[in-house]
Amino acid sequence: MRKMMPMNPKQLKKLMKQLDMRQLEGVKEVIIKMEDREIIIKEPIVTVIKAMGEKMYQIAGGSEEEKAIINISEEDIKLVMEQAGVDYETAKKALEETGGDLAEAILRLTDSGVE
């Protein structure tokens, strides 16, 4: 098996130019959305590779967080608003924090004294 020789930065830069590769600067996070969850990659290294008229994005490094997507209906938000006497954003946040559980969201809001 051949051992790969390390490349110096100048050679690497030349190779990246030949392959039409470049690194995106200032990327804070990448979110991959799936039907039931999201994967959030913080502080990733993102490289764009152009080949045959297409762009490919390579994502590396960073810390990864996975969270479930909760679909909250407008009716649920309105119900929590009415029952707990709170504004739209407060009701929505409570539902998100409780995984969409209406009763739990209302109880949390009324027990905490939020008006």
Swiss-Prot record:
GO terms for biological process: protein transport. Disulfide bonds: none annotated. GO terms for molecular function: RNA binding. It comes from the Archaea. Gene3D superfamilies: DNA helicase RuvA subunit, C-terminal domain (1.10.8.10), Nascent polypeptide-associated complex domain (2.20.70.30). Residues 6-72 form the NAC-A/B domain. Pfam families: NAC, UBA_HYPK. Homodimer. Interacts with the ribosome. Binds ribosomal RNA. Belongs to the NAC-alpha family. This is Nascent polypeptide-associated complex protein. It comes from Pyrococcus horikoshii (strain ATCC 700860 / DSM 12428 / JCM 9974 / NBRC 100139 / OT-3). The gene is nac.
